[in-house]
Design a protein with these regions (language model features):
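A short, structure-level motif marking secondary-structure boundaries and short turns
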Residues: 28-30, 54, 85, 128-131, ...
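Histidine-acidic metal/acid-base catalytic patches
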Residues: 65-79, 90-191
Length: 191
């Protein structure tokens, strides 16, 4: 990860998304992982300062909102924040609105999406909540956007379609285009 700051700098990035783990593939307890991450992220803060680039840990099907908050509070630097993925907290059994209430002031980047239950997928699989265009799922995207604005977020709103719901009968490009239109409409309504 430390070498990636140089790449981000070459691109002119001011925020770099990072992923810490993935609960699906990790069998070890989270306590030791969290302690290692805190130490690694403290080192990363020094590199981030040198480059003037903040890094944003995504809730990538790995850590709960409380665990992420624990990391942020332990590292205690403006150079570390969150990439808030609107759907990934649901996939861990958490409410994204409650997660936003805890983490909103730390959001440096976003993955905006909407989800629908995929009845054909095994319930324990992450894709049992499959992506649909924004506005066609069950996530309270308008409320999450309002919470982001109220927290002072001024960064990008990146649409992410990760695993299309089988009932959506268009391709990913169509889902992204539809999502962008809806996201623009929702953002205009925040003014």
């Amino acid at each position: 990860m430390l070498d990636s700051f140089g790449h981000a700098d070459l691109l002119g990035a001011k925020v770099m998304r990072v992923v810490s783990s993935n609960r699906i593939y990790r069998g070890e307890p989270h306590g030791p992982q969290l302690e290692r991450l805190k130490a690694q992220y403290r080192q990363a803060v020094d590199v981030a300062k040198r480059y003037g680039i903040r890094f944003a840990v995504e809730n990538h099907l790995d850590y709960s909102a409380d665990e992420l908050l624990e990391i942020l509070e332990a590292v205690d630097s403006p150079y570390i924040g969150i990439t808030f993925d609107f759907g990934n907290f649901v996939r861990l059994g958490e409410d994204p609105v409650e997660a936003m209430a805890k983490l909103g002031k730390f959001v440096y980047a976003t993955h905006v999406k909407d989800l629908r239950v995929n009845e054909d997928a095994p319930q324990e699989e992450w894709y049992s909540y499959s992506a649909v265009p924004i506005g066609e799922g069950f996530l309270d995207v308008p409320r999450l956007l309002r919470m982001l604005k109220d927290a002072g977020y001024t960064g990008l709103l990146a649409v992410e379609i990760d695993c299309l719901h089988p009932a959506y009968h268009h391709d990913e490009d169509a889902a992204v285009a539809q999502s962008v239109r809806e996201l623009k409409r929702l953002v205009q309504g925040l003014s």
